[in-house]
Swiss-Prot record:
Sorted UniProt keywords: Amino-acid biosynthesis, Arginine biosynthesis, Cytoplasm, NADP, Oxidoreductase
Gene that this polypeptide is encoded by: argC
This protein's record includes keyword NADP: yes
UniProt family annotation: Belongs to the NAGSA dehydrogenase family. Type 2 subfamily.
EC code: 1.2.1.38
Name listed for the protein in its UniProt record: N-acetyl-gamma-glutamyl-phosphate reductase
NCBIfam families assigned to the protein according to its UniProt record, in alphabetical order: argC_other (TIGR01851)
EC class (word): oxidoreductase
Pathway recorded for this protein: Amino-acid biosynthesis; L-arginine biosynthesis; N(2)-acetyl-L-ornithine from L-glutamate: step 3/4
The species this protein was found in: Sinorhizobium fredii (strain NBRC 101917 / NGR234)
Coiled coil: none
Single biological process term from Gene Ontology: L-arginine biosynthetic process
Amino acid sequence: MKPKIFIDGEHGTTGLQIRARMAGRSDLELLSIPEAERRNAALREDLLNGADIAILCLPDDASREAVAMVAGNNRVRIIDTSTAHRVAPDWAYGFAEMDKAQPAKIRDARHVSNPGCYPTGAIGVIRPLRQAGILPDGYPVTVNAVSGYTGGGKQMIAQIEDENHADHISAPHFLYGLPLKHKHVPEMKMHGMLERAPIFSPSVGKFPQGMIVQVPLYLDDLAPGATLESIHAALVEHYAGQSIVEVVPLSAQLARIDATELAGKDTMKLFVFGTPGGAHVNLVALLDNLGKGASGAAVQNMDLMLSA
């Protein structure tokens, strides 16, 4: 019997991308709700409880509501793409490459929280250095990032693409999250194994999909003897044998990085920039905000759960 998959919120940006990734898969039975019925709570509850895996592509409160709808049904497993459960101790964090044991945790979990796009890049470069003892306790981490505008969902897509929108955004690039209380910071801190919350400065570019996440570091403030080469080696060791996350060879000769390079792909590239013998290093993650940063990761997690 084919596993039944229900995407609750399939008509939103992330849900549509997940649905597209499942197109043509004969190994799955996709349960669907007509767009006109998407707010029909009784129908949603029936479909949620009829699924083997429910993928929630909803705002935080609606995700909590959906989880409550299946609370008494131990057969239903959940992947939540919202921020509602990303730091919950009883949910597996769905970044399979962040730790050697993570794929098994995801495979065996009833509840999996899909990572945020920015945290995927930030944790991807920070956590290996924490585990290797290179990034010390209490280091004041900063994370700077730019995302494609689809990360803002249908509302931001309309604001940018529709010149007649009442709140049209014409700027080619803009900062947001200016009070420094972005919803992604708690998961960066927890899953990045940080003692202090990072200073996070997100921004949006006038391109649909793509993302660059940067974490600059002072070498003198890292573990004694830390170098450009030792940091790169730690990332290479951490991601050895991984097909989705690639650590690019030492990249000092690259003239630029295009935020859209991995648009439409579910992979992530990590770079280590700096001058050999210099005082600084810049860690860079490149990914698609809707790929490894959202929908691609959700499908990856679903496949891990189905392999149990």
